[in-house]
Amino acid sequence: VRSAGIGAFDGDIASGGALRAVVEHNLDLSGHRATLLTREVANWANLILVMSVTHFMSVTELGAGEVSSLITSFADGREGGVMLESVPDPAGGTEEEYSETFELIRDLVDKVLQRIGPLGYR
C-alpha cells in the first residue's frame, strides 16, 4: 500500500486540519510525508483508488486508468467506469469538515477492505 497525490509536494507534512482530525480517533499522522503521484508510482499499482473524478482523470493521463476507480464507486461495487460522488476535499475548511471527511473515508476504507480480499488484490 502506498499513498500519493496529484497536487502533493514531495515531503510535505499533513495539513493541520488533517492532523487534528485524526487525533480524535487516536491516530497520528506526524510521520506522514506527501508523495507526488508519478507515472512510476501509478505503474507500480494494481489498484488505485482516488477521491474525485479529477483525480481519476489525472491517473488516466498517467496511463493507469485500467487499475483505477473512484473510491466511492469501488466501495459500492461499481468500479469499471461507473462514477459516484467524489469525496469532498476539506482543504482550507473547518475542523468539522475535516472530521466529517475523516469519517467518510474511514467508512469507505472499511468497505474497500471487505472487497479486496475476495477479489484477490495484494
Predicted regions and their residues:
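Phosphate-binding/catalytic loops
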Residues: 47, 53-122
